[in-house]
């Protein structure tokens, strides 16, 4: 079976693009927004809607394989790829990547993924944006699965010499800034790993001595013990602090 055509469509992600540099420089929360001036190239606001690109492989039998190109919340920070805007990258996919697949046989996932993963963009001389590779390889996996009438997990297991898990894979839930109310929802639904909690600002969230994050972790522990649906529920706590503790304690690991 062959890939007849590659089609792209712009979309929105489930979360946001946040300018981490501006937030660390003091941009303040205002509801779901941040007030401040963007400091990272590409941003027009400190927080703006996350963007995605849906990549669709139209197959010979009429089936459609899907993949979603999406980037991380803090795009452009810490050496990451630049802000992923659909209007900038749909032309790249259509002009440079679609020809790698259109009219080609569907082979294996690894072989098809390598076409984009290991390719060098003729327009930049670099490998493609991580979001592009993430989404296009998803479409490759879905195409192989559909051509073989298998689940995507089965294709991965077969190609990498492993087995599909017989147990549920733990999923990490993220609260965003509403770290108290959303933690309650996670506890109610027995989330495996929680809550992320988005401690990305020293003064307002972490505390100048780390006291706010300490208070939150204590509250979270007690909340689980008080409200968990059963005693067998013992979730993993994952708190993301975005390097703020290094700022608070001046990178003193003994503090």
Task: Enumerate the language-model features and the residues they cover.
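Short beta-strand elements
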Residues: 53-61, 65-71, 180-195
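Solvent-exposed loop and beta-edge segments used for protein-protein assembly and interaction
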Residues: 47-51, 135, 163-165, 231-233
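Extended, Lys/Arg-enriched charged tracts that mediate electrostatic binding to polyanionic substrates
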Residues: 23-38, 144-148, 152-157, 161-165
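Metal-dependent enolase-superfamily TIM-barrel catalytic cores that perform enediolate-based chemistry
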Residues: 171-255
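Glycine-rich, aromatic-flanked loop segments that form ligand/cofactor-binding clefts
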Residues: 58, 141-144, 157-186
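Short, Gly/Pro- and small/polar-rich lid/capping loops
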Residues: 1-56
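Metal- or metallocofactor-binding catalytic centers and their adjacent structured scaffolds
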Residues: 58, 64-148
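Short alpha-helical segments and helix-capping/turn motifs at coil-helix boundaries
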Residues: 39-42, 51-53, 138-139, 152-158, ...
